[in-house]
Amino acid sequence: MSRLVLAIGNSRWHWGIFSRDQAPQFWDAIAPHQPFSRSDLATFLQAQDPAIVADTPIAIASVVPQQLALLPEDWPQRRLQLRDVPLTNCYPQLGLDRAIALYEAGCQAGWPVLMIDCGTAITINAGDAEGQFAGGAILPGVTLQLRSLAQGTAALPSVEISAEGDRWGMDNQSAIASGVIYGIAGALRGFIEDWRSHHPQRPIYFTGGDGELLAKLLTDLPDIRVEPHLLLHGIDRLAQAMMTDPD
């Protein structure tokens, strides 16, 4: 039987289908503007995989709690919370997505590990040798920085970035792209080098929509791993563990 997972982010819903018989499937969708009915949700899911049956339980992690109301109440759901993540030393306001993705990185690579999630906000998340949350940082993501320049200035244009360009921009668009991309990469390099001074030769995971783009600017650093769907893998891992050990 297929297993459905959903990560509700700030701007998109990230879906995954896991099963024993085939490789996982992943897709993203813009957050819906109105609630799903049961039939609408079934149609939406079966468009991705006709083998999905109605009422297949969905394991969910959300950083936007109010969007949970967009799912039909009578569709089976397992809504994960921070207390469900076996990661100790978490502060109460730690984002659920950060905790799950860091835990999954530790499960895949062992501890200590560093996980960098490059989404709307970029979060840097450290786990120590005992599998505890060891601190981190939050900074505006690529799109958020681009939007702030376009909205907060009179003369600078709106810019979209799909690939890294020349560091030395020859017009406003390329200068903005360079400043944002290389500025973020420089900040991440500083955190990585500091962490590696304490944990040499330990892996660093990049995930999130801009994870691959930013990781490409740091390929001189050893053992950089890009796992776009780290959070969805973590949700599935936790949901399966909760099914086998409901207490």
UniProtKB/Swiss-Prot annotation:
InterPro entries: ATPase_NBD, Type_III_PanK. Keywords: ATP-binding, Coenzyme A biosynthesis, Cytoplasm, Kinase, Metal-binding, Nucleotide-binding, Potassium, Transferase. The keyword Transferase applies. It holds the Pfam family Pan_kinase. GO terms for biological process: coenzyme A biosynthetic process. Homodimer. CDD domains: ASKHA_NBD_PanK-III (cd24015). It catalyses: (R)-pantothenate + ATP = (R)-4'-phosphopantothenate + ADP + H(+). GO terms for molecular function: ATP binding; metal ion binding; pantothenate kinase activity. Belongs to the type III pantothenate kinase family. GO terms for cellular component: cytoplasm. The active site is at D97. The keyword ATP-binding applies. HAMAP family: Pantothen_kinase_3. Pathway: Cofactor biosynthesis; coenzyme A biosynthesis; CoA from (R)-pantothenate: step 1/5. A monovalent cation. Ammonium or potassium. Its main location: cytoplasm. This is Type III pantothenate kinase. Its EC number is 2.7.1.33. Catalyzes the phosphorylation of pantothenate (Pan), the first step in CoA biosynthesis. It comes from Synechococcus sp. (strain ATCC 27144 / PCC 6301 / SAUG 1402/1) (Anacystis nidulans). It is found in: Cytoplasm. Substrate binds at Y91, G95, L96, D97, R98. Its cofactor is NH4(+); K(+). K(+) binds at D117. ATP binds at A7, I8, G9, N10, S11, R12, W13, H14, T120. The lineage of its organism: Bacteria, Bacillati, Cyanobacteriota, Cyanophyceae, Synechococcales.
